[in-house]
Amino acid sequence: MEPVTLTTDRLVLRAVGPQDTEAVYAACQDADIRRWTTIPSPYLPEHARGFTEQMVPDGWANDSMFTFGLFLPAGDLVGMLGVTMISLGVGEIGFWGAKEHRGRGHVTEAAVAVARWAFTDRAVDRLEWRAEVGNTASRAVAQRAGFTMEGTLRSGINNQGTRRDCWIGSLLPSDLSLPSTSPYLPAQT
């Protein structure tokens, strides 16, 4: 599909392209982004070029990964957010916030907007969030966006060649008062 642009009260969410390579490269020099995400480390200019010129457009073109740069109206990059399709109707959300823009709710705002879009326009019925145990900032964003924490997966992610435990949470359309595309029958306890 062709990339879409979403707007919130404070942000413009759009696919990044070659014009954003330098901003992506600069943001990814932050030690916290390198520590808690699976980007290459060290993060080189060619990694940013590959991301903005190949990975992002290819993900949109083959409907496998929908990546949004989070921008202020003036054009400043405040973060990145993507939804990777992992099975029919199920996507996994991932995000990071640029160091100088953290703590202002931008990533949470974007996560809710992209979740609404995924549920209504992409027929997603479940969004999963995962983060390495200890990444309390990512967990706080997910919780503020409405994700339900479901537990800890042992050896649930691979970061820089090392298996690590991760937290997992989910967001369903009903959590945002939206209909699902498929019936959902919760377990009876």
Give the location of each predicted region.
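A short helix-loop-beta-strand connector motif used in the catalytic cores of GNAT acetyltransferases and
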Residues: M55-G69
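Juxtamembrane helix-loop transition sites at the ends of transmembrane segments
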Residues: H47, E53-V56, W167, L172
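Conserved GNAT-fold acetyl-CoA-binding loop/helix
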Residues: D32-Q54
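Hydrophobic residues in alpha-helical segments
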Residues: C28, T37, G59-A61
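Acyl-donor (CoA/ACP) binding surface of acyl/acetyltransferases
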Residues: M1-D32, T67-T189
